């Protein structure tokens, strides 16, 4: 395949054109007064979004060199979204600003490598300053404010996320689903829930809810199929004498064993319920062990030399209450020791750090949540499907932002934190003039998020930025109301992690682009003139009439 090459300024200008076009589309969404972008879909209704990364992902150019520039900045937005969950528009605006200022310096004859070193030094200094300014995000009010800002000033979303986090804890799993009504709804599952229901409907003891409810039950965990009742006789006799109910969690319960359990349950000899173990393969073994630790029981497994015939009441776990429905089993208040549960959580966390698979990481996070707190489901309500998609995306963004805030704390929002972090650059000096220029490029670039927020709100950016820079601490400009004041008191907060990741990712990609000297792309294929020859053959069709 033949290639096309571009060098020096020509290459950088083409790249810059792509970056500018992409940034123009993304930056209109920034701030409380940012606008929507409508994205065409190959089928169905178009998507309306105010999410920077959704806009960036849709953009591709026919011009190959422009497209390269756009794709590199798209990477900035995606990486920021993946690691911090928000701040994609901020990252795009910062990347464009660093690139534009840097390109001017390179065109003026400065050394791109020294500019890059200067930018890197400045990013390090600003990052340290941001972390020093960061305040922990502990209370529900701060969490709600972070969620509100991330969801484009939608207070209902901020409030429901704060409520969900309060109920399931910082470690709990919060999932977002489509709702049925117009309002957002929150449902919380306390304790450990897994998606396996009763094996037989004859175990139901609450006809109203079609569920089996067991108060203060024993829990028998078996890592195999149970088909013979003989294996379980000693355990069943012990449970019957104690007068407490029994939940059996096994790979499967079938045949004679299931029939005997059902008959005993219906006659009231032993109050019992059987469910299949959650998961498959190694994950099933791990989840059975999780349940064992949560309920202070033992998994009966031949792998560790424990047989069902030899099981005693000491091997059984217990809980305050268990509810089994057709589809789910919920264990409430297992009697496991807190120290053992915490050790198990730490062990799963270590596995999360090591795994490279996103799917495995998600499943491990679910296991942590089930052990640590519970699961909350936010059902997003909307009038139309188009609104539902847009709102759901905002809820997910806000959720990521609040998690980031809990992780690394919060700073003043609206671009104020970056303006304050400029002070870290006052005493910073590079090894030469070109590095000093790199530091100045970043000094100017970190004003760009505030400038863009102010511009989108219809105010004069330079006036606002200068006024904010004259003051200190959290003093800033509320673009939603047009007022100046303490950003934290006004509830305008940004997660430190989001601001930090946006800056680091933007500087990383922009400085790479500045040091580019050559670009290589495939030459577009030339269409061969086959059409004319084919059409010529069609002329012979006229003679067909004579053949009839």
Curated annotation (Swiss-Prot):
Main location (coarse class): cytoplasm
Molecular function GO labels: ATP binding; ATP-dependent protein folding chaperone; isomerase activity; unfolded protein binding
Gene3D superfamilies: GroEL, GroEL-like equatorial domain, TCP-1-like chaperonin intermediate domain
Domain of life of the source: Bacteria
Annotated ATP binding sites: 29-32, 50, 86-90, 414, 478-480, 494
PROSITE patterns, per database record: CHAPERONINS_CPN60
Pfam families referenced in this protein's UniProt entry, alphabetically: Cpn60_TCP1
Catalytic activity, reaction form: ATP + H2O + a folded polypeptide = ADP + phosphate + an unfolded polypeptide
Subcellular location: Cytoplasm
Annotated InterPro entries: Chaperonin_Cpn60_CS, Cpn60/GroEL, Cpn60/GroEL/TCP-1, GroEL-like_apical_dom_sf, GROEL-like_equatorial_sf, TCP-1-like_intermed_sf
An individual GO BP term: protein refolding
Chaperone keyword on record: yes
SUPFAM superfamilies for this protein: GroEL apical domain-like, GroEL equatorial domain-like, GroEL-intermediate domain like
Alphabetized UniProt keyword annotations: ATP-binding, Chaperone, Cytoplasm, Isomerase, Nucleotide-binding
GO cellular component, one term: cytoplasm
EC main group: isomerase
EC number(s) on file: 5.6.1.7
Record keyword ATP-binding present: yes
Biological function: Together with its co-chaperonin GroES, plays an essential role in assisting protein folding. The GroEL-GroES system forms a nano-cage that allows encapsulation of the non-native substrate proteins and provides a physical environment optimized to promote and accelerate protein folding.
Homology family: Belongs to the chaperonin (HSP60) family.
Quaternary organization: Forms a cylinder of 14 subunits composed of two heptameric rings stacked back-to-back. Interacts with the co-chaperonin GroES.
PANTHER family with a match to the protein in the record: 60 KDA HEAT SHOCK PROTEIN, MITOCHONDRIAL
Name the UniProt record assigns to this protein: Chaperonin GroEL
Source species of the chain: Legionella pneumophila (strain Paris)
């Amino acid at each position: 395949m033949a290639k096309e090459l571009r060098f020096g300024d020509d290459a950088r200008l083409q790249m810059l054109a792509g970056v500018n076009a992409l940034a123009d589309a993304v930056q209109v969404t920034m701030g409380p007064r940012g606008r929507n972008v409508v994205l065409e879909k190959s089928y169905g209704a178009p998507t309306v979004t105010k999410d920077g990364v959704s806009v960036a992902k849709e953009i591709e150019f026919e011009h190959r060199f422009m497209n390269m520039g756009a794709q590199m900045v798209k990477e900035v937005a995606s990486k920021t979204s993946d690691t911090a969950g928000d701040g994609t528009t901020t990252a795009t605006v910062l990347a464009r600003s660093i690139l534009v200022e840097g390109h001017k310096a390179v065109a003026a004859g400065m050394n791109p490598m020294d500019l890059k070193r200067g930018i890197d030094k400045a990013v390090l200094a600003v990052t340290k300053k941001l972390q020093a300014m960061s305040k922990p995000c502990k209370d529900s009010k701060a969490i709600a404010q972070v969620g509100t800002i991330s969801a484009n000033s939608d207070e209902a979303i901020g409030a429901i996320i704060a409520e969900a986090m309060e109920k399931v804890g910082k470690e709990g799993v919060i999932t977002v689903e489509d709702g049925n009504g117009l309002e957002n709804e929150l449902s919380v599952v306390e304790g450990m829930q897994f998606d396996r229901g009763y094996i037989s409907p004859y175990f139901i003891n609450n006809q109203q809810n079609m569920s089996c409810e067991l108060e203060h039950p024993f829990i028998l965990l078996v890592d195999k199929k149970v088909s013979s009742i003989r294996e379980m006789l000693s355990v069943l006799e012990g449970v019957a004498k104690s007068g407490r109910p029994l939940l059996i969690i096994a790979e499967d319960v079938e045949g004679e064993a299931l029939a005997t359990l059902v008959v005993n349950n219906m006659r009231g000899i032993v109050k019992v319920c059987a469910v299949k173990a959650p998961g498959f393969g190694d994950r099933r073994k791990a989840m059975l062990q999780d349940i064992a630790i949560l309920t202070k029981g033992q998994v009966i497994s031949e792998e560790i030399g424990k047989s069902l015939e030899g099981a005693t009441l000491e091997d059984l776990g217990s809980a305050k209450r268990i509810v089994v429905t057709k589809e789910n089993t919920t264990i409430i208040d297992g009697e496991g020791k807190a120290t053992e549960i915490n050790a198990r959580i730490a062990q799963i966390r270590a596995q999360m750090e090591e795994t490279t698979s996103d799917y495995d990481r998600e499943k491990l996070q679910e296991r942590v949540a089930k052990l640590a707190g519970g699961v909350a489901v936010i059902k997003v309500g909307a009038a139309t499907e188009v609104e539902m998609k847009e709102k759901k995306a905002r809820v997910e963004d806000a959720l990521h932002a609040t998690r980031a805030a809990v992780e690394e704390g919060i700073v003043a929002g609206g671009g104020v934190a970056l303006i304050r972090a400029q002070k870290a650059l006052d005493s910073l000096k590079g090894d030469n003039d070109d590095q000093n220029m790199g530091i100045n490029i970043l000094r100017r670039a970190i004003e760009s998020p505030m400038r863009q927020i102010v511009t989108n709100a219809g105010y004069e950016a330079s006036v606002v930025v200068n006024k904010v820079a004259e003051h200190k601490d959290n003093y800033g400009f509320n673009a939603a109301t047009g007022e100046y004041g303490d950003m934290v008191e006004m509830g305008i907060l940004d997660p430190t992690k989001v601001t930090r990741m946006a800056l680091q990712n933007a500087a990383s990609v922009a400085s790479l682009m500045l040091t580019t000297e050559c670009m290589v792309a495939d030459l577009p294929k030339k269409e061969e003139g086959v059409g004319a020859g084919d059409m010529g053959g069609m002329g012979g069709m006229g003679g067909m009439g004579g053949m009839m």
